[in-house]
Design a protein with these regions (language model features):
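Cytosolic, long alpha-helical scaffolding segments
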Residues: 1-257
Length: 257
């Protein structure tokens, strides 16, 4: 979902200010001191909150695409696709900076109540986690780029369901955050155990092949690094789920003890 540019938030316009000079023009400089009606403040805050949500949803979508594309690049040893994933990280960083700027402006100009403030700060923290997830996807793509042209490979069947689950986890936890859905957040966190199981399976399978065939040590190491980055994505998702639980309950809880 794209964020929309807005202009003039917080401005109070006198309907006669465009006319001839006189007492009205003399007071134009003081218009910004006139308090806005409460419903205008609330409407503006709603717009700002909506833009922050849109930015987080956009980041989540970009990161999800990155994970799946990085996996495809690894599976097919596609250097061009891997490079595309690596380059696209800049777009995620741009969205993060935009969201952070909106959060800062909203806090400074709208004086949100405690619950809205917690929500805004949580969304800002989540953009950091999503940015790091994007970095992990980029790291998977870098391993894929290094494997381009390699003819001797190891078996890593469990990496595909691992990448698919990691992408799904990102999508689900972002939706849980936007809706402040505690139940969904807990379900997402619980599924991290499956990512861990798949990671250990990949690790055991690849290590076994590396031990029996020295030619597979280098490609096997690349696959193990890729699996590690996917496992780290799962941990980052759990961090976001913990933020959702805090927003819903006010309690700080470790969902990955």
């Amino acid at each position: 979902m794209e964020s929309h540019e807005r202009a003039g938030h917080g401005q109070v316009m006198d309907p006669d200010a465009s006319g001839a000079g006189g007492p009205v023009n003399e007071g134009v400089g003081q218009l910004d001191q006139i308090p806005r009606p409460a419903h205008h403040i609330l409407a503006s805050l709603d717009i700002e909150m909506g833009d922050v949500k849109d930015g987080v949803l956009r980041m989540g979508s970009l990161v999800e695409d990155q994970i799946l594309a990085a996996h495809d690049a690894l599976l097919n040893r596609d250097a061009a696709l891997a490079q595309k994933v690596i380059t696209s990280d800049g777009r995620i960083n741009e969205v993060q900076r935009a969201v952070t700027a909106i959060v800062a402006m909203t806090i400074a100009t709208q004086a949100p109540v405690a619950s809205d403030l917690r929500f805004l700060l949580a969304l800002d923290r989540v953009t950091y986690e999503l940015e790091r997830i994007g970095d992990h996807a980029g790291s998977v793509a870098k391993q894929a780029r290094k494997l381009a042209g390699v003819t001797i490979m190891v078996t890593y069947d469990e990496l595909t369901p691992m990448a698919e689950l990691a992408a799904r986890q990102v999508r689900d936890v972002v939706m849980a955050l936007v809706d402040i859905d505690e139940t969904r957040a807990r379900e997402v966190a619980a599924r991290d155990d499956e990512i861990d199981r798949l990671y250990h399976q990949v690790f055991d399978d690849v290590l076994a092949e590396m031990r029996t065939d020295p030619a597979k040590v280098d490609p096997g190491t690349r696959i193990l690094f890729a699996a590690h980055y996917l496992e780290r994505i799962g941990d980052r998702v759990t961090n976001i789920a913990e933020d959702v639980v805090f927003l819903a309950t006010g309690e700080v809880e470790d969902l990955n003890p």
